[in-house]
UniProtKB/Swiss-Prot annotation:
It holds the Pfam family FA_synthesis. It comes from Ureaplasma parvum serovar 3 (strain ATCC 700970). GO terms for molecular function: phosphate:acyl-[acyl carrier protein] acyltransferase activity. NCBIfam families: plsX. It is found in: Cytoplasm. The gene is plsX. This is Phosphate acyltransferase.
């Protein structure tokens, strides 16, 4: 049986290298029958962390890293960086997918320049999984890759995200993020996307307001990169603020009894909205399976992102996306 090959960029993020190497080892041993993980980075730093397992992991050596403060322009001077090398390996079909925690803007630009877009696609999109109150997720895209979009772009985002959502839900509900649910609301590209989606065979429910995202009114929610990014960061910020507020209140002597009683509920809420369980965001629209995790990712987040990447490759999602796009565009 041919093994799934994953490229793992080990450089350019804010946390210790131990997190990514431990995640690589543990995830490999969970799937060693059909998985190979190719580590891209500084071999002198990676090998000691692998201990006796170093023979199990091919290493693409480089000492050049794209840093979080690099720009697209400065990154061009680092053609031998771990990110560039991994992308070239993916383009040359030496692997099935790639995971990085590196610089987001540089990653999207270089992935676009190296791998290219799928047929029918004009813009890429970042798609994270947003945890919802019922324990599920909403596929939210775009959250920052493409700010200047039209209705066709949103329509294409919906097709691609719908393909991935079908891995979890047989008939995913699709919506467009807007300031109201009425058909006349929004900008021209909202109206254009609305009309295109209405005439498609997707399970389209219409416009969706930001206040219902966490209630999983839809399984796929499409937006321009500016609005989607604001929505995502607002949810993350509110979650952290409420969590910190409750922690501070529970520390007060007068609230100790209430804290003990509500601790199980608090843990349940925290688990429901834990982004670490869904720490990988797809870069959709490119001719490859690419996942980006947080620049400050820890062991758990790398494990989560590897799981997302592995399952997507195993389900042959890239070819399914191509089929769905061709079906809509009559090829």
């Amino acid at each position: 049986m041919e093994k799934i090959k994953i490229l793992l960029d080990t450089m350019g993020y804010e946390n210790d290298l131990e997190h990514v190497i431990k995640a690589a080892k543990d995830f490999y041993y969970q799937h060693e029958d059909d998985l190979e993980i190719i580590l891209v980075g500084n071999e002198q730093l990676i090998k000691p962390l692998l201990d006796n397992d170093w023979r199990l992991f091919p290493i693409v050596h480089t000492e050049v890293s794209i840093e979080q403060n690099d720009t697209i322009l400065s990154a061009r001077k680092k053609q031998n960086s771990s990110m560039h090398l991994a992308l070239r390996y993916l383009k040359d079909k030496q692997a099935d997918g790639m995971l990085t925690a590196g610089n987001s803007a540089v990653f999207v630009y270089n992935a676009y320049a190296t791998i290219g877009l799928l047929e029918h696609i004009k813009k890429p999109a970042f798609m994270p999984f947003v945890p919802t109150i019922d324990g599920g997720v909403t596929n939210l895209l775009d959250v920052g890759a493409s700010i200047d979009v039209d209705g066709t772009d949103l329509f294409n985002f919906a097709i691609m995200a719908n393909t991935i959502a079908k891995m979890r839900t047989p008939n995913p509900r699709v919506g467009v993020l807007n300031i109201g649910t009425e058909d006349h609301k929004g900008l021209p590209y909202h109206q254009e996307a609305n009309e295109l989606l209405k005439t498609s065979n997707l399970n389209y429910v219409g416009f969706v307001e930001p206040k219902t995202i966490l209630e999983r009114e839809v399984d796929v929610l499409v937006a321009d990169g500016f609005s989607g990014n604001i929505a995502l960061k607002t949810m993350e910020g509110v979650g952290k603020t409420i969590s910190n507020f409750l922690k501070n209140e529970y520390k007060k002597p007068k609230n100790l009894f209430a804290a003990l009683l509500s601790k199980p509920i608090f843990k349940k809420i925290k688990k429901a909205f834990d982004y670490k369980e869904h720490a990988g965001a797809f870069v959709l629209g490119l001719d490859g399976i690419l996942v980006k995790t947080h620049g400050s990712a820890d062991y758990q987040q790398f494990m989560s992102a590897l799981k997302i990447l592995y399952e997507t490759i195993k389900a042959d999602v890239l070819n399914e996306i191509k089929k769905d796009l061709n079906n809509y565009y009559g090829q």
